[in-house]
């Protein structure tokens, strides 16, 4: 359905001129080849979903399209009635004592572990503190342990200990994964030494728990793959195929237990949708439950207690931040914007799942606010606004002056001020963290994003279908990945001087790939619903136009191949050895990609938020872990 390009009479004569910025509008380059529990209301009361598509007449008598999206699931009462005891000092003091005790465990490894198990013991500790979500407390200990392991690394891998006579697939797979994730230069060729003549990585006729865990670690290692064009990386695909098949068959044979649940989690979330806090929540439930996972009890018990306490203590921080987010949401006039999706709680949850260090409150709140605003703008440009109104709004944003609202229809005035005030506030937060003014830099990113939305609105209004390449180049900008990441990222205690920022943000390949990932994955999940709302333009339709005779299935297969390639390119950009940019500086942008990918794993989780996304909120935000 075409948008109706009719302006209210009061707006027709208004001309908005914008103040130019010093930097020029960019175009993205193409991407490369018991306890007390959380006290809640007696009953959860979720707003009832509505999925009907409709056309409504606004106050100015213009027929406007609305998306019929699911309404907001999280009303004020759900948040305001949250209560948790874990903000009390006693819990924090206990956590601090446990942190010291775990440090002692790291320190004692050099004394207690024999030379036939010293390597696997160090890898076991590093892997488990990371999977349990408590690694931020042990950065020095982790580096020391991995330096030790790497000093014994060979082209054939490692054994369980420094005195082991032969190398071991379990130690090598776990070591390869952990070392690569921390930036050590390790080649995938090492896995070739564990294949037999028919391509099997290990023969497991008994299918013991130990054998199964070897395959779990091989599968986890295989997902940290670089593009196959790199030497040795072909074996990663073979390892993934072999171990995935083995684990899926194993799930059909073994009883329901913590090991089967661990396998299920690993297979379901892999690497690119395995958000760190969600992984921690899932792993807490299975850690230490199987006897083969029970290293000396002191280690397991201390790690598990600390992980549970840390998880619950952070929920007390989340409660305070959610209250702040709700105040912003109400004060910004968001409840009165009825044509859009309201997913501020879901976006906050995603931010909390990738940056749950207490000091990163600015990132979590900034990400939730930016994504909420971008969702409002997306629905306004795609559905509710007319082309002429949207031209006025785009020009008004470029003026960056509250008086620019004089040009706008009434419903746009509040949206404009929400953008204006929030971007300015985030810029002030970024200036505190980075020590320099980044407002003009951020404004340029927002302007580019709205220009790309404007282009899509024109395509929708005229029914024009661009080429696949033209659509994708514009779509990488309109995906809004850059805008959602930029300002929240700059509020963190990670330094982003200009020479580092350009390697993480535009014009870096990391940024280009992240934008491409969001556009490609989003279109594969949204194109049918978008088409039902009158939005014909998508990667799928443009590919089919460029390739006469191609079916939707052909287009989806092509996009999925592209997505697989982008994932490996992203891995390389994050982890390539000898990079001038620390992994910590790139990791947050990379993790934002993982968060968006999670939302689109099975469906458009931002429009249909009552399934996986709702479960994520419940599991990581609202439900505490029993101690």
From Swiss-Prot:
The Enzyme Commission number assigned here is: 4.2.3.111
Q: Which residues does Mg(2+) 1 bind? A: 378, 382
The entry marks the following residues as binding Mg(2+) 2, namely 378, 382
Q: Does the keyword Phosphoprotein apply?
A: no
Q: Where in the cell is it found?
A: Plastid, Chloroplast
UniProt record similarity statement: Belongs to the terpene synthase family. Tpsd subfamily.
Function text: Involved in defensive oleoresin formation in conifers in response to insect attack or other injury. Involved in monoterpene (C10) olefins biosynthesis. Produces 57.3% alpha-terpineol (15.1% (+)/84.9% (-)), 27.6% limonene (25.2% (+)/74.8% (-)), 8% terpinolene, 4.7% beta-pinene (14.8% (+)/85.2% (-)), 1.3% alpha-pinene (100% (+)) and 1.1% myrcene.
Q: What is this protein called?
A: (-)-alpha-terpineol synthase, chloroplastic
């Amino acid at each position: 359905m075409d948008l109706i390009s009719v302006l209210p009479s009061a707006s027709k004569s208004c001309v908005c001129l914008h103040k130019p910025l010093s930097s020029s509008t960019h175009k993205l380059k193409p991407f490369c080849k018991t306890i007390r529990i959380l006290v809640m209301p007696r009953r959860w009361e979720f707003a009832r979903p509505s999925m009907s598509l409709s056309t409504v007449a606004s106050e100015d008598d213009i027929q406007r399209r609305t998306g019929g999206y699911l309404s907001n699931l999280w009303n004020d009462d759900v948040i305001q009635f949250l209560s948790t005891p874990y903000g009390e000092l006693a819990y924090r003091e206990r956590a601090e004592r446990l942190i010291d005790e775990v440090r002692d465990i790291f320190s004692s490894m050099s004394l207690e572990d024999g030379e036939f198990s010293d390597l696997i013991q160090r890898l076991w500790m590093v892997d488990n503190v990371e999977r349990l979500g408590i690694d931020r407390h042990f950065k020095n200990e982790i580096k020391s342990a991995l330096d030790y392991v790497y000093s014994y690394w060979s082209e054939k891998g490692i054994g369980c200990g420094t005195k082991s006579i032969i190398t071991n697939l379990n130690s090598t797979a776990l070591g390869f994964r952990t070392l690569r994730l921390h930036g050590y230069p390790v080649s995938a060729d090492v896995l070739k030494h564990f294949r037999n003549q028919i391509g099997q990585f290990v023969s497991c006729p008994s299918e013991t728990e130990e054998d199964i865990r070897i395959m779990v670690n091989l599968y986890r290692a295989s997902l940290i793959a670089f593009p196959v064009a790199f030497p040795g990386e072909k074996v990663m695909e073979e390892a993934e195929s072999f171990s995935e098949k083995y684990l899926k068959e194993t799930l059909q044979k073994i009883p329901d237990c913590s090991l089967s649940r661990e396998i299920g989690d690993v297979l379901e979330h892999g690497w690119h949708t395995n958000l760190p806090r969600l992984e921690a929540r899932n792993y807490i439930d299975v850690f230490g439950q199987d006897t083969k996972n029970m290293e000396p009890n002191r280690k397991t018990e201390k790690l598990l207690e600390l992980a549970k306490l840390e998880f619950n203590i952070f929920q007390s921080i989340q409660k305070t931040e959610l209250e702040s987010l709700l105040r912003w949401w109400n004060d910004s006039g968001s409840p009165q914007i009825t044509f859009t999706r309201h997913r501020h709680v879901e976006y906050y949850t995603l931010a909390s799942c990738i940056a749950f260090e207490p000091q990163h409150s600015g990132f979590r709140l900034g990400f939730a606010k930016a994504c909420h605003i971008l969702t409002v703008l997306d629905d306004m440009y795609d559905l509710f606004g007319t082309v002429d109104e949207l031209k006025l709004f785009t020009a008004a944003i470029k003026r960056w002056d509250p008086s620019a609202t004089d040009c706008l229809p009434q419903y746009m005035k509040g949206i404009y001020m929400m953008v204006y005030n929030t971007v300015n506030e985030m810029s002030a937060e970024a200036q505190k963290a980075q020590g320099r003014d980044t407002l003009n830099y951020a404004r340029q990113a927002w302007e580019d994003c709205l220009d790309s939305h404007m282009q899509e609105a024109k395509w929708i209004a005229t029914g024009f279908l661009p080429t696949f390449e033209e659509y994708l180049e514009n779509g990488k900008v309109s995906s809004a990945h850059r805008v959602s990441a930029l300002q929240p990222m700059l509020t963190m205690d990670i330094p982003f001087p200009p020479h580092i920022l350009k390697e993480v943000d535009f014009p870096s390949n990391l940024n280009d790939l992240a934008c491409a990932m969001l556009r490609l994955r989003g279109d594969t999940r949204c194109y049918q619903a978008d088409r039902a709302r009158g939005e014909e333009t998508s990667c799928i339709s443009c590919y089919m136009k460029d390739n006469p005779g191609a079916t939707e299935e052909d287009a989806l297969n092509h996009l999925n191949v592209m997505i697989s390639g982008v994932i490996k390119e992203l891995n390389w950009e994050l982890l390539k050895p000898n990079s001038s940019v620390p992994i910590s500086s790139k990791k947050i942008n990379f993790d934002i990609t993982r968060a968006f990918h999670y939302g689109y794993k099975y469906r458009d989780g931002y429009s249909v938020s009552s399934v996986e996304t709702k479960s994520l909120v419940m599991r990581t935000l609202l439900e505490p872990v029993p101690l």
